Every structure is written in C-alpha cells, then in structure tokens.
C-alpha cells in the first residue's frame, strides 16, 4: 500500500522565499548594514553558485558527508543489533535504558565539549552523529520486533523454520516500516548534530568550519549558502535511504510471492 505523499509543496517553498525576500528588503531599508543581518535569497543563490565552482566547496561537502553519514551507518548497525538483543533478553533492555535516557536528555553541545576531551576534531562529527542517531533507531527497531505477528512466530516454531528464514521472512518485513520511520527522523538529527560538532570542534576542511568562518567575518551570504547546502544534502540522502529501503521491501515481497 502506498503512503500518502508528505513531500514539501512547491507553493509553500515559494511562499517562504517571498517572506525571506521581503524581510531582507525591509532590513536593508531600515538599517545601513541590513544585508549583514539577513542576506536576500538572490544573494545567497549567487554565492552558492560561486562556491560550487570551487574545488574547496566540494571537498568540504564530501568531508562532512563522509563523516556524518559514516556516523549514521555505524549507529544504525549498532542500534539494530542491540535492539534485537534487547527483544530477546529483557536484562539487555534494562541495562541499556539508563544510557538511552542520558543520550536523549543531555544537550548535544555538552556531548560535543566532553567528546573533545577524548577525541580529535576530525573524528568528532562521526561520534556525535552516531550518538544522536542511536536512540531513535534502537527504540523504533525494538518496537518493531516486539510487534511482530505472534501467530507467524508460533507457526515458524511449529514447522521448525530456521532462524535465518524467520529473520528474512518474518522479522524484516514487519520491522522495516519502523526502521523507515526511524531513518526519516535520524537523518535530519545526525546532520544537525554532526554540523554542530564540526562548528564547535573546528574540524578542518568541513562545512562546519566554513560556517564558523562565515560567522566570524560577518559573511551572511556565505552563512546562508552553507546552511542551504546542509539542508539539500540532508534532504537528498533522506530520499536516497528511503528509496533504498522501499526497494529492499519490494524485493522481499517479490521473494515471498515468487514474482518475477
């Protein structure tokens, strides 16, 4: 069954761009240096194209993407494994509960500053991204495993279906919707947390470093341009990951029904 589209509507984007443009014009009219307070969409777009024409732009984008998505993938792997363990053993869930509560309640900035004591700025974004992604993925996958159809599991036990077949034929199809929901939430969180780690840790050659430099030199158009890059990369990889999950789910459905 297809889900109702929740994509951003073009008219809504245009509306907020107009609001942004009007606000920038009002500030320029009210203050001599109003452009320093809020760059216009046109200025940001021009600056974005200028940055995209440099090799340093692509190196920074690749650097941040590799570190932030690396942390995301590491967290997903660990969260799925520990969720499966917690679903099987109650003590494992009880053991992890305080850790999950701490991660969810402590501010990201506190984790970043503490992590800088132990880690270099180059690996900081990986660690922080993984740390922030872990709780939602763990919680969703654990919920998905626990909501697996008990009648199917009973049938698998009666017919002595191997564990591998139970995982691919029962657990995965019923857990994927929960994992998909977690990915939608976690990808946005990891980009925000990872970029914050780069800004505070001044990770060399990263988007976060460019944001910090733009702030120090009052380059408002650069600040907005790099922010737009983060938004675009986050949206792009969310679409790619969700597409991959959907394709995987369709392939499993085909395997289950022997479709060609």
Stretches with model-predicted labels:
Residues 3-31:
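N-terminal signal-anchor transmembrane alpha helix
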Residues 117, 145, 192-230, 253-259:
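Glycine-rich helix-loop "coupling/hinge" segments at transmembrane-helix boundaries
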Residues 70-100, 113:
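Transmembrane-helix boundary motif in ABC transporter permease subunits
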Residues 27-73:
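Periplasmic/extracellular loop-to-transmembrane helix junction in inner-membrane transport proteins
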Residues 140-179, 211:
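Short cytoplasmic-facing helical segments at TM-TM junctions of multi-pass membrane proteins
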Residues 127, 131, 164-197, 225, ...:
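Transmembrane alpha-helices
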Residues 101-136, 143-144:
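Generic hydrophobic transmembrane alpha-helix motif, especially the helices
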Residues 90, 177, 181, 224-260:
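C-terminal transmembrane helix and the adjacent membrane-cytosol boundary/short C-terminal tail
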């Amino acid at each position: 069954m297809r889900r109702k589209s929740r994509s951003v509507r073009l008219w809504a984007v245009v509306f907020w761009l107009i609001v942004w443009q009007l606000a920038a014009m009002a500030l320029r009219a009210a203050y001599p240096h109003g452009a320093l307070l809020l760059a216009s969409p046109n200025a940001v777009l021009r600056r974005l194209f200028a940055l995209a024409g440099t090799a340093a732009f692509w190196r920074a984008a690749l650097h941040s993407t590799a570190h932030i998505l690396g942390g995301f993938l590491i967290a997903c792997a660990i969260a799925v494994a520990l969720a499966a363990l917690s679903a099987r053993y109650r003590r494992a869930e009880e053991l992890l509960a305080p850790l999950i509560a701490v991660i969810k309640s402590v501010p990201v900035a506190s984790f970043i500053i503490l992590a800088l004591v132990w880690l270099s700025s180059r690996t900081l974004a990986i660690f922080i991204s993984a740390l922030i992604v872990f709780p939602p993925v763990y919680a969703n996958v654990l919920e998905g495993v626990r909501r697996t159809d008990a009648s199917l599991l009973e049938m698998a036990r009666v017919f002595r279906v191997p564990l591998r077949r139970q995982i691919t034929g029962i657990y995965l199809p019923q857990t994927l919707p929960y994992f998909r929901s977690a990915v939608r939430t976690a990808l946005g969180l990891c980009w925000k947390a990872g970029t914050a780690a780069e800004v505070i840790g001044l990770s060399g050659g990263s988007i976060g470093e460019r944001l910090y430099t733009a702030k120090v030199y009052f380059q408002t158009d650069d600040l907005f341009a790099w922010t737009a890059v983060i938004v675009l990369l986050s949206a792009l990889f969310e679409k790619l990951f969700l597409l991959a999950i959907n394709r995987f789910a369709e392939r499993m459905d085909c395997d289950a029904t022997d479709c060609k």
